Amino acid sequence: MNRLLLAGWIFFILLSVCTESFSGMVVSQTVAFHFQPHPDLSQFLVMDFTELTVPEAFIQKIGHAFSFFVLTYLLWKQRGSIRSAAAGSFAFAFFTEVLQLFFSRNGCIRDVLIDAVGIGLFYGLYVLAKRRKQEMYEKY
């Protein structure tokens, strides 16, 4: 069951990043792809955070973090190693942002960092929960 959930979540992320418009996918339920074989790879290095002042963009970036929080959880359940899950999620975040450049989307390092917030949040909660469990075990 975990494999199926993981595969489905990865598929959802890939569909979301490759479709021409995430908003179009959500609002009008249309999925369209526009492959660009020679993207401007320098766009990957853009670190413009002013876009986050737009509420819709900010909500979408929360979705980025949430997606990778969930992915990290699912990878952890599958692999059993939090470090492996976090590393796999981070590698996938990097991959998906580069992939977006080939589908006329704005893939950039800023979004990898936003994805890393979700990964780090799960990792941090995992460490806290593990520490709390260990403290409870030592207490009794």
Swiss-Prot record:
InterPro entries membership: VanZ-like (IPR006976)
Recorded topology in the membrane: Multi-pass membrane protein
Residue ranges of the TM segments: 4-24, 56-76, 84-104, 109-129
Keywords, comma-separated and alphabetical: Cell membrane, Membrane, Transmembrane, Transmembrane helix
Domain of life of the native organism: Bacteria
Induction: Expression is sigma F-dependent.
Cellular component aspect of the GO annotation: plasma membrane
Protein name: Uncharacterized membrane protein YwnJ
Organism: Bacillus subtilis (strain 168)
Record gene name: ywnJ
